[in-house]
């Protein structure tokens, strides 16, 4: 039975759930494995970590991270997405005793303060408008433990001609004005506004996707 989606101003991809596992690798062409490895390395998950994945889609990357977690030590990852069809598919394909999925909007997380050791997000923030970007990062900060890590991989200010061409074309082709905010390079500023340390730009892909990492300071 398909789960109901959560109301949100962000763009949900219920319609894409049946083919999402086929489409995502096409978007990253031949660099899917390299991209996944870069996100994993930035996150550096430990066996006892509790991790949150924002905008997890059908949970392929969520599941990859879960493989190093040990539920006997309390290790687990929870993927959230506002699209009920995505979470339905994720639970059916990839749910386990260390990999959980919930229908939830990133701007309104149903978790207590300081619940997670790390928060990750892959190609999610370009689907939501500026106010939800800001709210989602504030929520990520709230649910992170002091010293916790935030890893965001998403569209960023283009660094090459081709990157600029693809990112601007995507904005108009997919009718997503939210992409323009990413292209302007707003994500690092929004992370800092939310209270995180200065974001590091760890790796770039295709001239317009960046893997960011920042932290919640130990004293907060």
What is each PLM-predicted segment?
Residues 1-44, 60-64:
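Conserved class I S-adenosyl-L-methionine
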Residues 4-7, 151-194, 198-211:
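C-terminal alpha-helical "lid/dimerization" subdomain adjacent to the S-adenosyl-L-methionine
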Residues 52-108:
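Class I SAM-dependent methyltransferase SAM/SAH-binding core
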Residues 107-119:
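A short acidic, Gly/Pro-enriched loop at the edge of an enzyme's catalytic core
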Residues 134-146:
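A short glycine-rich, Lys/Arg-flanked "PGG" loop and its adjoining helix->strand segment in the class I
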Residues 212-220:
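C-terminal lobe and adjacent flexible extensions of AdoMet/dcAdoMet transferase-like proteins
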């Amino acid at each position: 039975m398909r789960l109901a989606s959560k109301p949100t101003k962000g763009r949900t991809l219920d319609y894409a759930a049946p083919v999402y596992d086929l489409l995502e690798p096409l978007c990253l062409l031949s660099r899917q494995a390299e991209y996944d490895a870069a996100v994993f390395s930035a996150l550096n998950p430990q066996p006892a970590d509790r991790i949150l994945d924002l905008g997890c889609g059908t949970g392929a990357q969520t599941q990859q991270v879960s493989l190093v977690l040990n539920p006997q030590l309390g290790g687990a990852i929870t993927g959230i997405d506002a699209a009920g069809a995505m979470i339905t598919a994720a639970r059916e394909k990839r749910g386990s005793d260390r990999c959980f999925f919930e229908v939830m909007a990133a701007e309104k997380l149903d978790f207590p303060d300081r619940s997670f050791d790390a928060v990750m997000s892959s190609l999610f923030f370009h689907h939501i408008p500026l106010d939800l970007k800001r709210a989602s990062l504030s929520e990520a900060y709230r649910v992170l433990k002091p010293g916790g890590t935030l890893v965001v991989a998403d569209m960023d200010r283009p660094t090459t001609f081709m990157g600029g061409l693809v990112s601007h074309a995507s904005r108009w082709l997919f009718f997503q004005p939210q992409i323009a905010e990413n292209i302007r390079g707003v994500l690092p500023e929004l992370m800092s506004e939310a209270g995180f340390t200065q974001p590091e730009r760890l790796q770039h892909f295709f001239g317009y996707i960046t893997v960011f990492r920042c932290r919640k300071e130990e004293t907060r």
